[in-house]
Amino acid sequence: MFFSAALRARAAGLTAHWGRHVRNLHKTVMQNGAGGALFVHRDTPENNPDTPFDFTPENYKRIEAIVKNYPEGHKAAAVLPVLDLAQRQNGWLPISAMNKVAEVLQVPPMRVYEVATFYTMYNRKPVGKYHIQVCTTTPCMLRNSDSILEAIQKKLGIKVGETTPDKLFTLIEVECLGACVNAPMVQINDNYYEDLTAKDIEEIIDELKAGKIPKPGPRSGRFSCEPAGGLTSLTEPPKGPGFGVQAGL
């Protein structure tokens, strides 16, 4: 097949153009550590294969109960919940904890690494006692989540990705947490705090500093995710069994 000189020159130009972009992309990825903490492990004094970790006797019993939920010979299916158990015990997941999970479940360590590096809910770096996760995806952003993030940073004196010197708070941004109807919202450890204002999040932080756990849920007075102006349907308790059924049936 023959191409004109102009077409060949155009193709060569496009190849060079995209080649530069690919090279720049690869260079950027390498500079950032191929995804930073997500994909790369480098031994540190606090995170290496010799970092002490073992499950407590109570958690070994929990692991036995978890494994029983899966068919015999399929312990590998329990990797996610057992990793979560390790994180709850230790606060985060050093590589030694991943190795222990692999040992307990009798799977290759790589199978555990694959899971721990894929899901961002696993913390592969130490985090504070209270892990503040601010949703900044579109619905929350449209409901002024930026003001929530700014208020937290100002209140704690830290930036996104940082931990307070007293190790009490870690602040990160996250993608959608599935509570768009209650935007803006944040997740702190396992709890959702919704319908927030800057004042609300400051009060929540004050309570946490005082050692109290604020009541989760909407801060606007809503019970759940009903319309802000009040219920428009389902305004009374549901009828009992048999309601509306033809007599005699």
UniProtKB/Swiss-Prot annotation:
Residues of the region (Disordered) are 213-249
- Enzyme class, broadest EC rank: translocase
Q: Where is the signal peptide?
A: none
Necessary cofactors: [2Fe-2S] cluster
Its EC number(s): 7.1.1.2
Q: Which reaction does it catalyse?
A: a ubiquinone + NADH + 5 H(+)(in) = a ubiquinol + NAD(+) + 4 H(+)(out)
At which residues is N6-acetyllysine found? K61
Q: How does it sit in the membrane?
A: Peripheral membrane protein
Protein name, per record: NADH dehydrogenase [ubiquinone] flavoprotein 2, mitochondrial
